[in-house]
A protein has these predicted regions:
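Helix-coil boundary/capping segments in enzymes
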Residues: 1-204
Length: 204
C-alpha cells in the first residue's frame, strides 16, 4: 500500500464537477491558463487522471492500494494547492477558490469509486473559512473520501493564525474527531513565498 500517492484531473475534466454558477467563469479562466508544471503536460501527465493506466502502473509496481493527495491545479488556483498560496484578493476570489477545491474533491470521490477498496482519497479544504471547511469535511465523509483532510500549510503572509490557535481551529479539530477523519499534512506545504530564483523550489 502506498501512503503518499498523488492524482488529480486534467484541467478541463474538472468542468462537470463545478457548481453551475462557476462554469462560465471557469471557461474564461481555462482559456488563458497555462499549466505551470512540465510533468503534467508531458507523456506521464495522464498517470494523474487515467484510471486504467494508473491501475496498470500500480500493479506493475506491486501496489494494491493507495492514499491519494492532490497533484494537479484546482480550478481558479494560481498553482498547486500543496504549495504557498497568497491570500484571496477579494471575496469573489475566495469563493472561486472554494469552488475549485469542491470540484477537485468531487472528481476525487468519483475517481476513487471506480476501484472500490484500492483508492483512499484525501479531501482538500481552505482554512480561510472554517465553517465552510467543516461542511466540506462532512460531505467528504459521506462521499467516501475516507483518507481524511489535507491540512494546508500556514506560512507567514497568508493571513491566517498559526495552527496551534485553538480558538480559530478548535471547531475544525472537533469535527474531524467526531467524524473519525484523519488529519494529513504534506511536507513542504508551509514553505513561505520565495523569489523566482532557480534554487527556490529546493525549499519545498
Amino acid at each position: 500500500i502506498s501512503a503518499d500517492c498523488h492524482a488529480g484531473a486534467e484541467l478541463l475534466e474538472y468542468r462537470p464537477f463545478l457548481d453551475k454558477e462557476y462554469v462560465s467563469q471557469f471557461d474564461a479562466w481555462a482559456e488563458t491558463y497555462e499549466v505551470p508544471y512540465e510533468d503534467l503536460k508531458g507523456p506521464d501527465g495522464p498517470r494523474n487522471w487515467d484510471s486504467d493506466r494508473r491501475l496498470a502502473d500500480m500493479e506493475a509496481d506491486g501496489i494494491v492500494a493507495e492514499v491519494i493527495y492532490p497533484n494537479t491545479i484546482p480550478p481558479f488556483y494560481p498553482k498547486s494547492s500543496l504549495t504557498y498560496q497568497p491570500p484571496p484578493a477579494n471575496s469573489g476570489d475566495a469563493a472561486r477558490r472554494w469552488a475549485g477545491l469542491r470540484a477537485h474533491n468531487r472528481w476525487l470521490a468519483d475517481f476513487c469509486s471506480r476501484t472500490p477498496g484500492r483508492r483512499v482519497g484525501i479531501c482538500q479544504i481552505n482554512l480561510h473559512d472554517i465553517e465552510a471547511s467543516i461542511k466540506e469535511i462532512r460531505w467528504a465523509k459521506s462521499a467516501g473520501l475516507t483518507g481524511g483532510i489535507l491540512l494546508p500549510g500556514v506560512p507567514p503572509g497568508v493571513g491566517l493564525p498559526e495552527l496551534y490557535d485553538i480558538n480559530y481551529y478548535g471547531p475544525l479539530w472537533a469535527a474531524c474527531e467526531e467524524l473519525g477523519m484523519p488529519v494529513n499534512h504534506h511536507g513542504g506545504s508551509a514553505s513561505p513565498a520565495m523569489t523566482e530564483a532557480v534554487e527556490s523550489p529546493v525549499i519545498f
